[in-house]
Structure formats: structure tokens, C-alpha cells
Regions:
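Local sequence-structure signature of Cys/Sec-based thiol-disulfide redox active-site neighborhoods
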Residues: 1-28
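Short alpha-helical
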Residues: 13-14, 44, 75
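Generic recognition of short, well-ordered alpha-helical segments
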Residues: 17-20, 51-52, 72
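Alpha-helix termini
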Residues: 26-32, 85
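Thiol-based oxidoreductase modules, predominantly thioredoxin-like and allied folds used
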Residues: 32-46
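Structural micro-motif
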Residues: 51-61
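Non-catalytic, surface beta->alpha helical segment in thiol-disulfide oxidoreductase systems
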Residues: 61-87
Length: 87
């Protein structure tokens, strides 16, 4: 299973939307619960944020590759889980 990093801002409404989508997807696809997602607040982990190529949050990286950036949709967040589970 691949490493997943989610860059967020604490007060970001789209990040909170992404959390809800993630919870819904885990209910629909129990195997997604096995995916460990490291959630990093760009204000608290500025060195990490500065080392990555993104502008909008939430942004998902799977094994260092940007999979999604910006406004989340169910399909885009599901693609993150699928990328993490892919061989």
C-alpha cells in the first residue's frame, strides 16, 4: 500500500468537505479504511508545505505524486484511495 499525504488548512471548508467524503467512501468501500492518510496542516508544517508543488487545499499526494488539488468530489477522492491501493 502506498503512502498518502493530505495537505490541509484547519479552517478550509473544502478540507472539511473532503473529510466527509472520505468517511462516506470508507462506509461504501470498507477496504479504504486500511489506507493510512497522513493529514498535514500547511501552517503547522510549513517546511513540508514549502517542499511540495501545490497551491490549493486540500491536496492529496500518493507516494509523492500529486493526485488531486482543490475542491474535492467523491470521484476525485475515490481516485486517491484507488491509487493508494494499486500495485
Amino acid at each position: 500500500m502506498k503512502d498518502v499525504l493530505m495537505m490541509i488548512l484547519e479552517d478550509c471548508p473544502y478540507c472539511h468537505q473532503a473529510y466527509r467524503i472520505m468517511e462516506d467512501l470508507k462506509k461504501e468501500h470498507p477496504e479504504y479504511a486500511e489506507v493510512s492518510i497522513r493529514i498535514a496542516d500547511e501552517e503547522k508544517e510549513s517546511a513540508l508545505a514549502d517542499s511540495l508543488d501545490y497551491y490549493y487545499v486540500p491536496t492529496y499526494f500518493v507516494d509523492g505524486k500529486k493526485i488531486h488539488e482543490g475542491v474535492p468530489t467523491k470521484e476525485k477522492v475515490q481516485a486517491v484511495y484507488e491509487a493508494a491501493l494499486a500495485d
